[in-house]
A protein has these predicted regions:
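Glycine-rich active-site loops that engage anionic ligands at enzyme catalytic sites
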Residues: 2-258
């Protein structure tokens, strides 16, 4: 007897002007790859397929893609059937987004939860930092706050539950972990994740009119350590416009600032 496909897509109506295609019930790179594969296919179809002509925003999440359309210009039922068929064809090849190498400072009040996490895991603080620096994180989705990246790839031994009592104020650009996820708070806000460091890089910048959010689903992120002095120097350069975000793209021919 054939086993059921646990990643088989489901089609869900989100009001009368949006469809959601959902894959499985777990968060994994394979599931997210199907989501991103479907998003790429729909983005191409918007250019030359009349059925997709009124499609607007595409919203990928951990395990689903929501597609907004104009119900006055589109046969919603036909669009839904086509989406479901495309979802069934979506492969699990990982979406290759951009690769970033971003600075982070782990010193002092930038990392208030680092000592507690290290103690809970029976590791030295240096060992926790080493594991974070050795990992490559994958952006699954942007959510919670504008530009807030939910990233998989956290080493399992560093998994940590959210704080029992969330902080009323988390500083902008704080590197944080919760459960098996890693994230960066692009804005000052309340939050319950464990704060392990801070980056001088602005992950959301309204001056970047075309794409204010720096990271996107499918991107990869690696971290490199900087001192407090280096952090402040980089922050000044970034805020002054001397160090554009593209400087942190990882490429064979490009050396990131240090």
């Amino acid at each position: 007897m054939d086993k059921p496909d646990l990643l088989a897509p489901r089609l869900l109506a989100l009001g009368d002007a949006a469809w959601t295609v959902e894959f499985g019930r777990e968060i994994s790179s394979e599931v997210n790859a199907r989501v991103m594969g479907l998003a790429e296919r729909v983005a191409l179809l918007r250019q030359d397929d009349p059925l997709f002509a009124s499609v607007g925003d595409l919203v990928p999440t951990f395990r689903s893609l929501t597609l907004h359309f104009d119900p006055l210009l589109t046969d919603a039922e036909a669009l839904g059937e086509r989406l479901l068929a495309l979802g069934q064809q979506a492969g699990s090849k990982l979406h290759e987004g951009r690769r970033w190498r971003l600075p982070v400072c782990f010193e002092g009040d930038f990392a208030p939860d680092l000592p507690r996490l290290a103690q809970a895991k029976g590791l030295g603080q240096d060992m926790v930092i080493e594991r974070l620096l050795a990992a490559e994180f994958r952006v699954y989705m942007i959510g919670f706050l504008p530009g807030f990246p939910y990233m998989g790839g956290l080493p399992p031994e560093l998994a940590m539950p959210r704080l029992a009592s969330p902080r009323q104020r988390v500083p902008a650009n704080s590197l944080a972990v919760a459960g098996e996820m890693c994230a960066v708070y692009p804005w000052e806000s309340p939050g319950g994740w464990n704060l392990l460091g801070r980056t001088p890089v602005q992950l959301f910048d309204l001056k970047q009119a075309g794409q204010p959010a720096m990271l996107a689903a499918g991107d990869r992120v690696r971290w490199y350590p900087v001192s407090r002095d280096e952090y402040e120097r980089l922050q000044q350069q970034i805020q002054g416009g001397a160090l554009p975000r593209e400087s942190f793209l990882q490429a064979e021919e490009q050396t990131c600032p240090a």
